[in-house]
Swiss-Prot record:
Its cofactor is Mg(2+). ATP binds at T10, F11, H18, G89, L90, R91, E99, N124, A125, F126, I127, S128, S129, S130. Belongs to the bacterial CoaD family. Its EC number is 2.7.7.3. HAMAP family: PPAT_bact. GO terms for molecular function: ATP binding; pantetheine-phosphate adenylyltransferase activity. Substrate binds at T10, K42, L74, R88. It comes from the Bacteria. This is Phosphopantetheine adenylyltransferase. Reversibly transfers an adenylyl group from ATP to 4'-phosphopantetheine, yielding dephospho-CoA (dPCoA) and pyrophosphate.
Length: 154
């Protein structure tokens, strides 16, 4: 049995949807490595350092969580951490096609690595970092979309 898993993402910023997936993954594994991606292809609102800081604050009450950044292939990071399970969230059918392709791509790079897909709870299904960023651009209230621990930081 696997005792740890990686939950990768840009987390720009972390949302209640992300936190929901993390909390439920904690019920399945002894340790979850939340891997904050330094993706050069994405223009982020928050720096890598800030995203790591926000994730650490948002998950500080969860003892099974370790937050790290990475800037390599996810499969290489998983090997480095001796982790065979990747966790991904699926909000809608539109997420499924992309996530399935990525899961297969990762599997083709390392046949030992499996991807587990979790759906967020219904109340979090519409939340995305993109929605949060759009609201933030117009100084809107995002307090119901993000973890309480980071409200003051945004």
């Amino acid at each position: 049995m696997y005792t740890k898993a990686i939950y990768p993402g840009t987390f720009d910023p972390v949302t209640n949807g992300h936190l929901d997936i993390i909390k439920r993954a904690c019920k399945m594994f002894d340790k979850i490595i939340v891997a904050v991606a330094d993706n050069k292809d994405k223009k982020t609102m928050f720096s890598l350092e800030k995203r790591v800081e926000l994730m650490k604050k948002a998950t500080s009450h969860l003892p099974k969580i370790e937050v790290e950044s990475f800037n390599s292939l996810l499969v290489d990071f998983a090997r480095e951490k001796e982790c065979k399970i990747i966790i991904r969230g699926l909000r809608a059918v539109s997420d499924f096609e992309y996530e399935l392709q990525m899961g297969y791509a990762n599997k083709s790079l390392d046949s030992e690595i499996d991807t587990i897909y979790l759906m967020p709870n219904l109340e979090n299904a519409f939340i995305s970092s993109s929605v949060v960023r759009s609201i933030l651009k117009y100084n809107g209230d995002v307090s119901h979309l993000i973890p309480n621990e980071i409200i003051k930081d945004l």
